Amino acid sequence: MSKRVGIIGAGVSGLAAIWCCLEEGLEPTCFERSDDVGGLWKFSDHTEEGRASIYQSVFTNSSKEMMCFPDFPYPDDYPNYIHHSKLQEYIKTYAQKKDLLRYIQFETLVSGIKKCPSFLVTGQWVVVTEKDGKQESTIFDAVMICSGHHVYPNLPTDSFPGLDQFRGNYLHSRDYKNPEAFKGKRVLVIGLGNSGSDIAVELSRLATQVIISTRSASWVMSRVWDDGYPWDMMYVTRFASFLRNVLPSFISDWLYVQKMNTWFKHENYGLMPLNGSLRKEPVFNDELPSRILCGTLSIKPSVKEFTETSAVFEDGTMFEAIDSVIFATGYDYSYPFLDETIMKSRNNEVTLFKGIFPPLMEKPTLAVIGLVQSLGAAIPTADLQAWWAAKVFANSCTLPTTNEMMDDTDEKMGKKLKCMFSSFFMFGQSQTLQTDYITYVDELGSFIGAKPNIPWLFLTDPRLALEVYFGPCSPYQFRLMGPGKWDGARNAILTQWNRTVKPTRTRVVSEVQRPHPFYNLLKMLSFPLLLLAVTLTFY
């Protein structure tokens, strides 16, 4: 008899979990509180309780070739950065083509997950659900939590003296949908993350004045990188990851800062992070420096206090006659249906082996999918997480001992996987695990047996090997070989640049030259000279 797996949430993580369970011969049942798939990307013009919320103008920050399901490329004519409506269309098509909808119970709330009395022997869970006023309990052999971490807003009102006397209105970015209500207003946005910068830039076209208050500032990157290609197609490569990991930190930090300042000098815009050499996760916004240059948007330090009509900043300056304050201050990490002790242990911190498995669990039958964040796309990360979890549930993979998992988790919490308070913001209370993208997905791929064997590829298929190592680390790489091999993976990798330029070549003038792997090879050969030059500069 197949093991039954309960899956919470039908966003991209939940859909990946359903498919991976089916591939491993498991029997999935997914519970989704809304009436459709998509999770975060299912837009609503009003905020819904218990659901993630996005604003009308949201586009992806990862390009289409980097954030697809690994055996399901986007249509050729899709833009490289996708509006939420187009992404939702893709997600629904994926669910339909993979025949996943019949495994989902829509408009069903999960109100509780608890261990069965026989858990120490069976590892089973009781999942309590509610639908149409009726409550039901179901026993599952394993559970995957795929409900995301952008649901419960962190609104740190206690951190801002005088806010209770402020006469204007304030709201969390979760409640922001469009700029119309702020036309002609003076608006303060607190928090410089992707949402905060997006909202501030959008408001700056209709509002009288917009100010962003940030505690530590941030690097700002454009989605458009070298030669006009998407940033992640150029940056997220195995070769680049190799250099970042082997270079001495003072050199890699210096190179990182130089690259971040190529577009504009952050210091001149008030955006230089407090620690200039810190490789802080960047903010993606193509218009922020332009709006600052136009004078419709300004950057200020932290708010010291509020008065009835103004905000006083740490540098003593004021923003007067404020109409609205928008807190883009992240989200609280919370799974209210689950006993919090299950995922917390030492120092009351989130403790998850590889960001997925609670290491102190007597039986490895609970997995959290989609909690880890990295400078890479969410969909392929969630897919690999769900695939590994499904293999563990199906007894195709085994986990290390509890002590080994705890030792690894403690090391990662102190180094690679850092427990951050709010994803990209300094105010939040969420405990999102962050890690280097390629290092992490390669690790998951190794557990599964799906990590591409680069030396073998160079011997057997040099053309493909060059693209895999020097080109973008696209999701198709993890379907080239191993248990989940997809026959279309090789062609998808070799044609990914064609799909990248297809939607932009609306007026063809000449043959487009895509980045050639040998260009990266030449860069690698010139690396010793670069290293020598930088070393001489510092010494």
Swiss-Prot record:
Task: Name any cofactors this protein relies on.
Answer: FAD
Top enzyme class: oxidoreductase
Topologically, how does it sit relative to the membrane?
Single-pass membrane protein
**Which cellular components does GO assign to this protein?**
endoplasmic reticulum membrane
Q: Where in the cell is it found?
A: Microsome membrane; Endoplasmic reticulum membrane
Query: What InterPro entries does the entry give?
Result: FAD/NAD-bd_sf (IPR036188), Flavin_mOase (IPR000960), Flavin_mOase-like (IPR020946), Flavin_mOase_3 (IPR002255), FMO-like (IPR050346)
Q: Which residues cross the membrane?
A: 518-538
* PANTHER family per the UniProt record, alphabetical: DIMETHYLANILINE MONOOXYGENASE
Put simply, this protein is called Putative dimethylaniline monooxygenase [N-oxide-forming] 6
